[in-house]
């Protein structure tokens, strides 16, 4: 049996998109909202320990959404081709990983592809899974080039967690605690992620051919 020849794979370009202006620690609840109309007791503890000083939200103050996950991802992909816009037409695979798609169907990758009409009819995949979704997307693109199925791919990782962290998502639980005459504060474990996560997207351009100049 003839042994398969495996190709080299190179990351030839990277890009990212972060929505709106950075939000400082002091302003976070202006965007996410106040649970039970009260400032968080855990916020300063978490922020002191995680060292984060600002983050990005796909929200306006008051919680109005400004970008979908798919829109952010498409903008990161387009940023790969800022100086060479026609090159997006040569991409043969779009591999988009996320833990927080805008909806279950159509898939996240398909929705991103819908925001990239210039890319044409290409293969699209949508890996999911907390923390590892972006790496799954990267590995799929890597293997497709490695095995010679294609020569050029884009892999993305993106999250839009802010919508799930808004105060209105916690109000039902707070009201039940009040009815039970318990301390109406969400447990530390549940509120912890509100002060850890933010929104954004990144994209890698992968190729079986090295850049003639620059990094690979």
Predicted regions and their residues:
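Condensing-enzyme catalytic core mediating Claisen C-C bond formation in acyl metabolism
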Residues: 1-67, 180-216
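Acyl-thioester C-C bond-transforming condensing/cleaving domain
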Residues: 2-6, 78-89, 103-106, 110-216
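Short, well-ordered amphipathic alpha-helical segments that serve as non-catalytic structural scaffolds
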Residues: 38-48, 68-84, 108-109
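Interfacial helix-loop-helix linkers and transmembrane-helix boundary segments
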Residues: 61, 88-91
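Short, surface-exposed alpha-helical recognition segments that flank or form part
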Residues: 64-71, 129
């Amino acid at each position: 049996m003839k042994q398969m020849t495996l190709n080299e794979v190179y990351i030839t370009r990277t890009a990212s998109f972060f929505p709106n202006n950075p939000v400082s620690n002091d302003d976070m609840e202006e965007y996410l909202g106040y649970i039970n109309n009260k400032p968080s007791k855990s916020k300063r503890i978490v922020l002191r320990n995680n060292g984060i000083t600002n983050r990005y939200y796909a929200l306006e103050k008051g919680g109005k959404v400004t970008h979908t996950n798919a829109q952010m991802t498409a903008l990161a992909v387009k940023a790969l081709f800022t100086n060479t816009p026609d090159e997006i037409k040569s991409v043969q695979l779009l591999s988009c990983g996320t833990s927080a798609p805008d909806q279950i169907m159509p898939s996240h990758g398909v929705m991103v592809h819908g925001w990239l009409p210039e890319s044409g009819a290409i293969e699209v995949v949508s890996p999911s899974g907390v923390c590892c979704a972006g790496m799954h997307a990267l590995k799929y693109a890597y293997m497709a080039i490695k095995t010679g199925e294609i020569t050029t791919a884009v892999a993305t990782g993106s999250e839009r967690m802010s919508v799930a962290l808004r105060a209105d998502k916690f109000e039902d639980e707070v009201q039940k605690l009040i009815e039970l005459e318990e301390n109406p504060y969400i447990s530390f474990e549940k509120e912890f992620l509100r002060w850890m996560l933010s929104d954004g997207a990144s994209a890698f351009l992968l190729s079986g051919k090295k850049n003639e100049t620059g990094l690979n």
